[in-house]
Amino acid sequence: CHSGPKFTNNVTVDVGTGGAFQVPPLVGVGWRTPLFHDGCAATIADRFGSCATARHGSIGSLSTQDISDLIAYLETL
């Protein structure tokens, strides 16, 4: 979903709620909170905690360090 130069495919999708939502770009994601269609992630880190769902990518195989590194990367976009 988050591909290309702005890290979005600009597609409207159903994230399991029955509603349609535009895939937002990841560029600037560190400055746009809360995150997700329902605002469940107050921070990027929350995406990997209480808001983690398979509909937003599988993170089960990521280590704690992988997640920390990914959060640091996302904050640079």
PLM regions with names:
Residues 1-77:
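Periplasmic c-type cytochrome electron-transfer domains
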